[in-house]
Amino acid sequence: MTALRKLLIVEDDEGLQRQLRWAYDDYEVIVAGDRASAIDALRLHEPDVVTLDLGLPPDPDGVEEGFRALGDILRLKPDTKIIVASGHGARSS
């Protein structure tokens, strides 16, 4: 049996964490809710792919912390594939 590829989901919204975990059930999913946890998980698990929400605590309405996380990930593991996502600018109905 082959090992599942590892996916690190960096998302502070618990509902979205659950949805993404469900959507990627063919991956070994690791979840982090903030930049520090994401960097710890990156070092520990060495994921193949990272999905990164730009709106992370302490300012989930901004993008600065997400860009800091992106920079940290690229500096530590430059070959990691990263999918950047953000709800900023999304329309509410």
What do these predicted regions represent?
Residues 1-3, 77:
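Short, flexible coil/linker segments at domain boundaries that flank nucleotide/cofactor-interacting
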Residues 52:
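Redox-cofactor binding/interface segments in oxidoreductases and associated redox assembly factors
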Residues 2, 13-36, 44, 49:
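Two-component/phosphorelay signaling modules centered on CheY-like receiver
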Residues 88-93:
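Negatively charged, flexible loop motifs adjacent to catalytic sites
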Residues 40, 55, 60-79:
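Short amphipathic alpha-helix used as the core "switch/output" element in two-component signaling
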